[in-house]
Each structure stands twice: as structure tokens, then as C-alpha cells.
Amino acid sequence: MGVKLEVFRMTIYLTFPVAMFWIANQAEWFEDYVIQRKRELWPPEKEDQPQELEDFKERIRKQREERLLRAAQQSS
């Protein structure tokens, strides 16, 4: 009984990881679950999003220049 049980346990220990790797590496499964989930979490950028970022950078740059100009005028 003990030897048969050990052989059964060893078979399960070896079969389970191999089966999980085989299932997880299926291309259809990967596309359906992983890629789709990634698209849900991080949707593609909108067309106007990069422009908004550039506008924000420009506003910050102008504010910084104005601050430096005021500081230079006050110190002289």
C-alpha cells in the first residue's frame, strides 16, 4: 500500500505542473485572457491625450520661466 501511494503521489506531483504549463502556454488562452485583461486595465491612448500632455508641459515651462524672470527682476 505504501509504495503504491508514493507512486501515485509522485505521478500527481509531476503531472500537475506539466499540465498547468501546457494549459497556460496555449496561444488561444493567452490571447483570450492575458491580452484582453491587459487591454481592459490599460486601454490604448486616445488621440488627444498626447496633445494634452504637450499643452501641460508648455504651461509648466511658461510658469517656470515667469517665476525665474520675476526672481531675477527682484534680485537686481
UniProtKB/Swiss-Prot annotation:
<keyword id="KW-0472">Membrane</keyword>
<dbReference type="InterPro" id="IPR018625">
    <property type="entry name" value="Pet100"/>
</dbReference>
<comment type="function">
    <text>Plays a role in mitochondrial complex IV assembly.</text>
</comment>
<keyword id="KW-0999">Mitochondrion inner membrane</keyword>
<comment type="similarity">
    <text>Belongs to the PET100 family.</text>
</comment>
<dbReference type="GO" id="GO:0051082">
    <property type="term" value="F:unfolded protein binding"/>
</dbReference>
<comment type="subunit">
    <text>Interacts with COX7A2.</text>
</comment>
<keyword id="KW-0812">Transmembrane</keyword>
<protein>
    <recommendedName>
        <fullName>Protein PET100 homolog, mitochondrial</fullName>
    </recommendedName>
</protein>
<keyword id="KW-0809">Transit peptide</keyword>
<dbReference type="Pfam" id="PF09803">
    <property type="entry name" value="Pet100"/>
</dbReference>
<keyword id="KW-1133">Transmembrane helix</keyword>
<keyword id="KW-0496">Mitochondrion</keyword>
<dbReference type="GO" id="GO:0005743">
    <property type="term" value="C:mitochondrial inner membrane"/>
</dbReference>
<dbReference type="GO" id="GO:0033617">
    <property type="term" value="P:mitochondrial cytochrome c oxidase assembly"/>
</dbReference>
<feature type="transmembrane region" description="Helical">
    <location>
        <begin position="7"/>
        <end position="24"/>
    </location>
</feature>
